[in-house]
Amino acid sequence: MTQIDLAPPASSTQPRIIDTDVAIIGAGPAGLFAAFELGMLRLRAVLIDALQEVGGQCAALYPEKPIYDIPAHPAISGGDLITALERQIAPFDMPRLLSRRVETLTGTQGDFTLTTSAGDTVCARAVVLAAGAGAFGPNRPPLDGLEAFEASGAVQYYVRRREDFRGRSVVIAGGGDSAVDWALALRGIAARIFVVHRRAKFRAAPESLAQLEQAAAAGEVELVVPYQLHGLQGAEGVLSVVEVATLDGEIRRLEADCLLPFFGLSMDLGPIAEWGLALERHHITIDPSRCETNVPGIFAIGDVATYPGKLKLILQGFSEAAMAAHAIHPIVHPDQALHFEYSTSTGVPG
């Protein structure tokens, strides 16, 4: 029986020259599944990502956060989802260029050349943009002295390990899914949880809101509404008080040693924005039947792509990955007919 090595291909930091069928920019869930779909069609691909590991936001920001809308998984953490996707693409042994940004893209369909910030050159017949939020970073609250508390870890924008907050008094600021989800996830771990939002109404999934109301009623979290962040108190990076205020100027002091502001991510497409692609509010517009952009041979999938009716769901990114892969096949093999087959019939190409 053939043994499959599930260790990921090595990603050298030395500049490389790679000739391949498809360059995938972005190694989050959509990019990884695109690699699988291309591999199933016997197409070669290379994964390129600015982060030092694959997984995108799932791995970098939310490895322990449960995801509830992946088919066949009642709940799966972001980290476990990425591990499963890596196992799925392991048989194809696709190279990875990590800790790099794509700086330039030249050429036309069938003959693209990409260069990276590490000096790599990639020649590809087609390009798949699975860049998620682009080069993402948190929207930071405008508070005096914020940098010192960021440096000490008293102010954090991502939760990588829930255990890091055991026994701590935590202020969570924000009114969206991330704020609500982490308030629920830190129950039973943090000693005290305050949730600060400038409005009384939160914007999150209905089931999550119902759980938040139950948690507040049970005293597991305290909802501090309608308040917004006003100031931080402490010394030498050690946080002791988070000040919040109403629009009328009423100030309240919350004793806490950690602040988690969840005000979303700022999106920066970087050089991608200069490639002549049709953009709509920092997203790339595509033909939803093929996931192709206005530039022939360049496709976009996942959160970076937009079209009427688009849902920013991981599972939709998976669907877009499959459509893009099938649309790319005739670009790479124009004289070869592609007959659609189910994986139950074909198996995984060896």
Curated annotation (Swiss-Prot):
It comes from the Bacteria. The keyword Flavoprotein applies. FAD binds at residues 49, 57, 62, 102, 136, 303, 344. GO terms for molecular function: ferredoxin-NADP+ reductase activity; flavin adenine dinucleotide binding; NADP binding. Its EC number is 1.18.1.2. It catalyses: 2 reduced [2Fe-2S]-[ferredoxin] + NADP(+) + H(+) = 2 oxidized [2Fe-2S]-[ferredoxin] + NADPH. This is Ferredoxin--NADP reductase. It comes from Granulibacter bethesdensis (strain ATCC BAA-1260 / CGDNIH1).
